[in-house]
Amino acid sequence: MKRILITIICIAAAALSVGAKNIKGTVKDTEGKGLAGVVVSDGLNVVQTDAKGRFVMDTDSESRFVFVSTPSGYKSAVLKGETLYYKRLGLSKTYDFVVEKKAKDDTNHNLIVIADPQISDADEFPELEVHAKDIGAFVKTLDGDDVFGLCLGDIVGWNHALYPEYNKVMSHTGIDFRNVMGNHDMTNYGDRHEGSMKDYENMYGPAWYSFNVGKVHYVVLNDNFFIGRDWYYIGYLDKRQLEWLANDLAYVPKGSTVIVSLHIPTTLSESDRKSFGYNDISEIMANKQGLYQLLQPYQSLILSGHMHTGNNQLIADNLMEHNVTGLCGAWWCGPVCCDGAPVGYKIYEIDGDKITW
């Protein structure tokens, strides 16, 4: 009997070891100096580097990436065209990162936001290029001030082979653009939600992550939940993301300014915050209250897209949502969106922890 019990225990331990994996690594600047207190995550677990820039983390079989929450004053370094803020988890047990110190202080910075470029055909790229060059011209007026961009999803319209050309056209902006995953960025006709992120992750890395600029903590989430049938989805944050967000925010001082970017809006009206309507299941987030609760200790702004209209909602005294108009408007059919708002981009000026637009 003892031998049987020992065998069972050994098998169970082996099974656990297959799922769990201990990894380590470093976060250094471009001169090779280790950076202390940098947050590193696998999309669930979150740790900080020690005084020498070293980290150790237990990860599991569901984790696909390890990434750095880029600290304020730094940007993700690029080596031979590879962005170094994330790495795909594999057989290696060591993952080293490099971040590059910015030339200027980023306490005051600018954020340019676009939503739903939704390029469905290569013939639409000239239209996108007009906007990209316009953004580039605006950036030049900032006279070297810190600025970066965010795309709130639906980068393309189902045809993910267009991603490389999209990236090329957006380079005309002259700035780094972080990306959010949209429902049109999903890999469809699979049987699991996790598989719906395949194409996006292959091009842009993790579908949820965080970074810091100045005094602001930025969070990117994926609330396009694939239900395992055709291309159908709902607005929903899965348990893993909510657990990760709680772990991530544990390193952010209470009262800080937090900007959350996602694709499907959490709310479009006061009424949808009071009661849930099944007809809206693909237009607003079903479990928004869980997100609101995590953001309660902070001064927060949520940025969303998806609707191709403009909408601002004051959710609480310390929480607002801006639903940003689509860059493609009514799918590149004219100069306005579905509600008549002009197509274009939104500009946010961040002065310390204060946001104006």
Which positions does each model-derived feature cover?
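Short acidic, glycine-rich surface-loop motifs adjacent to enzyme active sites
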Residues: L249-S275
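Hydrophobic beta-strand segments
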Residues: V38-D42, F65-V66
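Structural motif
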Residues: K21-A36
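Short Pro-Gly-centered beta-turn/loop motif in secreted/extracellular proteins
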Residues: K33-L35, V56-F65
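Extended active-site neighborhood of metal-dependent phosphoesterases/phosphodiesterases
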Residues: S72-A77, Y85, H160-K254, G277-L301, ...
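N-terminal active-site segment of His-dependent metallophosphoesterases
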Residues: N22, T70-P164
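Short, acidic Ser/Thr/Gly-rich low-complexity loop/linker segments typical of extracellular
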Residues: L44-D58
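A short, solvent-exposed beta-strand micro-motif common in secreted/extracellular proteins
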Residues: V46, S61-V78
